Amino acid sequence: SNIIKKILIFHQDMFYYKFNFILPNTKWVGTKACKFKNFKNPQWLRNVKDRKYKFYRLDTLFSETKYQSIEVKKNGGWHFTNIKTAEDIKHKLHSYLHHNEFEKSSLDIEDIQDIISNQKTIYNLKADKRVYKIGEGEKLEKIEVSHLPNYIKNNELKYKKWIQE
């Protein structure tokens, strides 16, 4: 009820493979929220652009994806992706929307394990969408468990497989 803007976008730290492998200088902006009265459908919310537009941008008055009434939560939480084994990541990428790109890469489980061991992302999020981006991406950094959500900190033994020493 204290949400004033039409759309909320959460800037979240991005983590790969292990709970404490962070992708520095990159924020996940895929987590969005709105009041139920403004909600159209899930795809509409996914398509909303992650930036505020100036009041004089007339195209925002007619756009389904560009809005002036956006609030960005700068410290919006954590986004964990591919917290999986190399085998499970391969299965996920074969099932993924862009599986053709993954299949062209000819990465096998050992290659994926090497990418994880070398603390790199499996694809380059900043690559031009028209070019090949699967393979070794950006370098991940290990952070201390103290920076993670309380639930993970309080259950560190339970999740030790997913926390890099």
Locate each region found by the language model.
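C-terminal accessory extensions appended to soluble enzyme cores
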Residues: 65, 69-165
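Nucleotidyltransferase catalytic core that binds NTPs
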Residues: 1-2, 144
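Conserved catalytic core of nucleotide-sugar-dependent glycosyltransferases
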Residues: 2-107, 113
